[in-house]
Design a protein with these regions (language model features):
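Active-site-adjacent structural elements that line small-molecule/cofactor binding pockets in enzymes
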Residues: 1-292
Length: 292
């Protein structure tokens, strides 16, 4: 479930996460933007309007700090980013932050990453918008190098180091799992080369069978070319918040081969209708589809 409600209220976030966990949801996902813009020229790729559905004054805490709060409030539910704008972060520091989170959560972290779509945000950070894909690839390689046991070395276009040690290491074998987001050939190839999961997203029209059939071969062929098992790359897709629509969409996602379906939360408060809405969602969607 995507976490987008009342994110500035730590008590709500903790209680909401505990409720979602108790109902058997598999994972909670945080979102990421360093800043939002009241006006922008960049085009949001997942709506025909080109506008993001998030209001510019939305409360959007840092996703890693938010996951630390979630890790302390829960015991079993998986925690991830959907999506962390990877090239906007420093990969050496991020590797340490994620390894620490994985330790403190006892191995429950998944890092979902994308290259970002808001050019204005990238320029605010004094970064190059045009090379964000190349930087994303290198940032992944840097983090994986630092998560290896022992002494690390890396030689790339942006980072070079040798004889360094970054501890603690992630709890999970092979490092924090990577979920690669995007809807392009480049994103699909990135998932095949580096990803544990691929998360194409078409919120304008829901899961797109034709687009997925076009993209998925890039995942599997790239994985095979890199000496990886193509079947080891999992597929995550998106549904909606309405229970009836979500069940139909989730069933369609499963037919497409999805290993996970991320849903949007129903609206409401913990003191009002939200607990009942989530419980209804569990009975009408999770249980019929094989959830707890």
């Amino acid at each position: 479930m995507l976490l987008i409600l009342n994110l500035a209220d730590p008590d709500f976030v903790a209680r909401y996460a505990q409720l979602v966990e108790s109902l058997g949801f598999e994972s909670l996902w945080t979102i990421d933007h360093a800043v939002m813009h009241a006006t922008y020229d960049s085009r949001y790729p997942y709506k025909t309007t080109g506008r993001t559905p998030l209001p510019p004054d939305s409360n959007m805490p840092d996703p890693l700090i938010l996951m630390a709060l979630l890790a302390g409030a829960t015991e079993r539910i998986r925690l991830g980013t959907s999506m962390l704008i990877l090239p906007q972060r420093h990969p050496i520091i991020l590797a340490k932050e994620l390894a620490t989170l994985d330790q403190y959560s006892k191995g429950r972290i998944t890092l979902g990453v994308g290259v970002g779509w808001v050019k204005e945000e990238v320029l605010d950070l004094k970064q190059n918008f045009g090379d964000r894909g190349r930087r994303t690839n290198e940032w992944i390689e840097v983090m994986k190098a630092l998560w290896d046991e022992g002494v690390s070395a890396y030689q790339g276009d942006y980072f070079q180091f040798e004889g360094v040690i970054s501890n603690p290491k992630p709890v999970q074998e092979g490092g924090v799992p990577l979920m690669i987001g995007g809807h392009s050939e480049a994103a699909a190839k990135r998932a095949g080369r580096y990803g544990d999961e691929f998360y194409p997203h078409w919120s304008t029209r829901g899961p797109d069978k034709e687009a997925l059939e076009t993209l998925w071969p890039f995942v599997t062929e790239t994985a095979a070319a890199c000496g990886r098992d193509p079947d080891a790359v999992k597929l995550t897709l998106t549904s909606t918040s309405d229970a009836k629509t979500s069940r139909e969409t989730a069933e369609f996602c499963r037919e497409l081969g999805a290993d996970r379906v991320v849903v949007l939360p129903p609206k409401g408060t913990l003191e009002g209708s939200l607990p009942d809405e989530l419980a209804r969602f569990r009975e009408e969607v999770l249980v019929p589809l094989g959830g707890e």
